[in-house]
């Protein structure tokens, strides 16, 4: 999936939808570490601030869990 920079939908929301879809379709499995903010920034050519906002929202929704010094991991989809 690609981000549409011309869309009226915010980039962080588009990224959230992409990551959720990857969790649901098995690209990222429960307990698996997702790419770092820097890696995601390069993959999607968007700022780390945008990446961080999407990740924080997904953590609040229970899709991801950040572990200090280790990374961000997939939680069981609720």
Predicted segments with their positions:
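Extreme N-terminal segment that seeds HTH/winged-HTH DNA-binding domains in transcriptional regulators
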Residues: 1-46, 60, 65
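Residues in the helix-turn-helix
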Residues: 50
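Short, hydrophobic-biased segments on the C-terminal half of alpha helices
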Residues: 55-56
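Conserved segment of winged-helix/HTH DNA-binding domains
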Residues: 77-78
